[in-house]
């Protein structure tokens, strides 16, 4: 059986917090023949105010409404919508409210065992990053699956 390579176009936070930019990027991605367009899901609750990048992440975080809009827009453009949650709360939103069954785990969250266990139960397909921090974290990750 031949495996198909899955192409994920990472928009991440490059939309600069502007939904019209995000939609424009989705249109461009559609023409690249990518299978998925991927964003990042976090909110102010995921951040601490003493984080040097707090203002940046606050600016580029997507609201729940933004997620719904971008998911629907992606569907209209015939490209699959995906996002990487940066907290259990955001994972619950993606899985339960948006009904997402495919989640890409951010490399920064590969050692968040609570998040990984939740996603393992709720997702049909978890797409994992290959950038593991060390051998121990790799073993913990593999043992969850």
Where are the model-predicted features located?
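Catalytic beta/alpha-barrel core
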Residues: 57-62, 79-87, 91, 101-112, ...
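Catalytic domains of carbohydrate-active enzymes, especially glycoside hydrolases
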Residues: 23-42, 97-99
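Glycine-rich anion/phosphate-binding loops
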Residues: 14-28, 64-65
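Glycine-enriched alpha-helix->loop->beta-strand junction motifs that scaffold or abut catalytic
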Residues: 33, 95-103, 120-126, 143-145
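N-terminal amphipathic alpha-helix/helix-capping segment at the start of soluble metabolic enzymes
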Residues: 1-12
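Glycine-rich, proline-tolerant flexible connector loops at the mouths of alpha/beta enzymes
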Residues: 35-64
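Conserved, mostly hydrophobic/aromatic
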Residues: 10, 29, 94
């Amino acid at each position: 059986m031949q495996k198909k390579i899955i192409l994920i176009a990472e928009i991440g936070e490059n939309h600069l917090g502007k939904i019209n930019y995000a939609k424009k990027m989705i249109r461009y991605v559609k023409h690249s023949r990518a299978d998925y367009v991927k964003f990042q899901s976090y909110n102010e609750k995921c951040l601490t105010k003493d984080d040097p990048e707090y203002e940046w992440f606050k600016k580029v975080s997507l609201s729940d409404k933004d997620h719904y809009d971008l998911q629907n827009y992606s569907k209209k453009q015939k490209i699959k919508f995906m996002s990487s949650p940066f907290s259990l709360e955001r994972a619950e939103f993606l899985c339960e409210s948006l009904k997402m069954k495919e989640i890409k785990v951010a490399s920064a969250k590969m050692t968040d065992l609570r998040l990984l266990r939740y996603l393992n139960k709720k997702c049909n397909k978890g797409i994992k990053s290959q950038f593991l921090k060390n051998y121990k974290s790799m073993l913990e990750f593999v043992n969850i699956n």
